[in-house]
Amino acid sequence: MEISEKAPAKLNLSLDTPFRHQDGEPEWRMVMTAIDLSDYVHIKTIPNSKEITVQTNTGFLPCDQRNLAYQAAKLLQSKLDKPEGVEIEIDKHIPVSAGMGGGSADAAAVLRGLNKIWNLNMSREELAKLALTIDSDVPFCVYSEPALVTGRGEKITPIGPLPPMWLVIAKPQASVSTPTILRQIHEQHLNHQEVQNVVSAIKQQDFDKMCRHMGNALEPITMKKCPDIIKIKDKMLQFGADAAQMSGSGPTVFGISQKKSRATHIYNSLRGFCKEVYLVRALDSLTTK
């Protein structure tokens, strides 16, 4: 059998890590949303086989056990002792190593797809619990709707649709290693973020309040490795964005505007500065067009 799954990118409207657990893993408090910039993951099961293969349309990704989509297929195959191999083909559109959860989105798509093909009838909560063993962003990507994400990434609380807005996304040429950034958390004095205020603003559909309280505690760390982040933020604000910040561990920056005309102006103005620029909207759910 075969199936195709949409794998939307994610953005962090607010990101804080208040402490580390004893095993060194960060505790997260984040407000996340999926956006309509997506990879497309095509999944085919092969009877009487245990082989898992991954193909992509880019040379920048590993196609072996290091690929999160591979790990997702292996996880379900092993846990359920399924006598079927899995062929995965990923049509990449999400920038790689950008802080937008592309690999996690692909892994979540594989979990959702195999859940359907194999008639597992696992709930989102069950899939998200499994997903945490792959990467901390995969549980959110199973949901792919606006949510408060806490714990190690496994506690997903949907918070309803965002206020109407447009998002302009720009990725600097540099790429950033998430593990490298996370290793420096304990070495830095982080500016802790008002995550709950962002949640309240979204529930109240208060766009201005949301903009005032947005923030990313990892931004100062990544900026030291990628100074273009501050340049892009400044340009977005100069061109009319209501707010601008880095997503995840970076280096991607996004700006938001309530008006499509202003967002389009920001998008056009940045295209000469960055090679990868996108004009997108947030997704209320995986079925949002």
Curated annotation (Swiss-Prot):
Q: Which GO terms describe its biological process?
A: isopentenyl diphosphate biosynthetic process, methylerythritol 4-phosphate pathway; terpenoid biosynthetic process
Name the InterPro entries for this protein. GHMP_kinase_C_dom, GHMP_kinase_C_sf, GHMP_kinase_N_dom, IspE, Ribosomal_Su5_D2-typ_SF, Ribsml_uS5_D2-typ_fold_subgr
Top-level EC class as recorded in UniProt: transferase
Domain of life of the native organism: Bacteria
Q: Give the keywords, sorted.
A: ATP-binding, Isoprene biosynthesis, Kinase, Nucleotide-binding, Transferase
Q: Which residues of this UniProt protein bind ATP?
A: 95-105
Residue stretches spanning the membrane = none
Q: EC number(s) on record?
A: 2.7.1.148
- The active site is formed by 10, 137
Q: Which reaction does it catalyse?
A: 4-CDP-2-C-methyl-D-erythritol + ATP = 4-CDP-2-C-methyl-D-erythritol 2-phosphate + ADP + H(+)
Please list the GO terms describing molecular function: 4-(cytidine 5'-diphospho)-2-C-methyl-D-erythritol kinase activity; ATP binding
Pathway(s) the chain acts in: Isoprenoid biosynthesis; isopentenyl diphosphate biosynthesis via DXP pathway; isopentenyl diphosphate from 1-deoxy-D-xylulose 5-phosphate: step 3/6
Q: What does this protein do?
A: Catalyzes the phosphorylation of the position 2 hydroxy group of 4-diphosphocytidyl-2C-methyl-D-erythritol.
Q: Which family does the record claim for this protein?
A: Belongs to the GHMP kinase family. IspE subfamily.
> Any idea what this protein is called?
4-diphosphocytidyl-2-C-methyl-D-erythritol kinase
Give the originating organism. Ligilactobacillus salivarius (strain UCC118) (Lactobacillus salivarius)
Gene behind this chain? ispE
